[in-house]
């Protein structure tokens, strides 16, 4: 099995996979439910690369990041990881799927991720080819599109899309 399958695949022998519940519970908690998940995808004209750990050496080349809020928070708060914050500060599209499920978890983690994504790159090691001028001027959140998918409307989700964030025009 590939490293991607080993890290993110479903282990049928896992006791967590043997649990059963009502249909709505099964719909949310099927497959690999690890809440610290991160994938970096690099898209090039000639090839596509997938990295299980986008914070590793290839992170500066990841065009698409798929990660749980907890994975982003842990990476952003780890000491000596300013490069992670610099990388997250130039996110142009933020897609939050099953946001209603995230509301029932630790919503503060989601808010911290949004603040990390709204930050200004501060490191001289930031990839200047990827950082656009509005992001350097603390107006990156005005250039970012938020897509929030939820099964119901909630004030916290509306605030995520409607309210001005730090540095927003």
Give the predicted meaning of each segment:
Residues 67-71, 148-153:
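A short beta-strand-to-loop transition that corresponds to the Sensor-1 phosphate-sensing loop
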Residues 31-33, 56-60, 84-88, 137-141:
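Conserved catalytic network of the ASCE P-loop NTPase/AAA+ motor domain
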Residues 139-145, 154-169:
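Interdomain hinge/linker at the junction between the two RecA-like core domains of SF2 helicases
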Residues 62-128:
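SF2 helicase catalytic motif II
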